[in-house]
Regions:
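Conserved short loop/turn motifs at secondary-structure junctions
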Residues: 46-55, 137-142, 171-177
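Catalytic-core region of right-hand nucleic acid polymerases
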Residues: 68, 177-204
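Conserved catalytic palm subdomain of right-hand nucleotidyl-transferase polymerases, strongest
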Residues: 38-47, 98-107, 149-188
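Electropositive, glycine- and tryptophan-enriched low-complexity nucleic-acid-binding patches
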Residues: 116, 124-140
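Short glycine-centered helix-capping/turn motifs at secondary-structure transition points
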Residues: 74, 130-131, 164
């Protein structure tokens, strides 16, 4: 400690390790991800997903090279950002002539979704390895779900009751929560690298 600093003075918060690069993928990982993927079709796909699976031994090296070029260059290809948007009525009783009654469902190409999966796995591994997930978070964490939240909540209530304590529960549900966030703020956080800036730029 410095002359003016007590040994017991509060220390500055620990800065989490930065995610500066994305580890390249390989043929084995791509093969596994492709075979595990749902056989869904998108109008933007040049060939059916089922055919990609059947020909994975031939296509895996090509797909691996394309995704690795995207990762190494820090650029999410513009063609991967294109999607087929289908308006879906939120509730049966809503006004069908009102645009706000619909939820836009975007269907991306198979290669785009595959690239997202590769990046997601690396980001999740980084967050997990460095203990960056919130202690009470259940979303986007392997082996966690809404059931995890309910079990934790139930356990807390039971413990409080056993101690004759009063329990108050406040629930907050934000409509279109992600859309209310300024994405430019998110992608400028220290943990986010240029790849994610490229991902959110000019999404169609």
């Amino acid at each position: 400690p410095s002359v003016n600093q007590s040994p017991h003075s509060p220390q500055p918060p620990h800065s989490p390790p930065k995610l500066t690069e994305l580890r390249p993928t390989d043929i084995d990982e791509i093969t596994k991800l492709v075979l595990q993927s749902p056989t869904k079709q998108c109008e933007l796909d040049p060939i059916p997903t089922s055919l990609v699976k059947q020909s994975i031994s031939v296509l895996a090296p090509i797909i691996t090279n394309i995704i690795n070029l995207s990762l190494s260059s820090g650029t999410f290809p513009s063609s991967f950002k294109l999607s087929v948007v289908t308006p879906l009525l939120k509730k049966p009783n809503l006004d069908k002539n009102n645009f706000s009654s619909y939820r836009p469902i975007s269907n991306l190409s198979f290669l785009s979704k595959l690239t997202e999966r590769v990046v997601k796995d690396r980001l999740s591994a980084h967050l997990s390895k460095n203990s960056l997930f919130n202690t009470f978070q259940s979303a986007y964490i392997p082996f966690h779900s809404t059931e995890s939240v309910l079990l934790s909540l139930y356990d807390s209530i039971i413990r409080a009751i056993s101690k004759q304590q009063v329990t108050c529960l406040c629930l907050l549900d934000l409509s279109a929560a992600f859309d209310t966030i300024d994405h430019s703020i998110l992608i400028h956080r220290p943990l986010i690298i240029s790849y994610f800036q490229s991902f959110h730029l000019d999404v169609c």
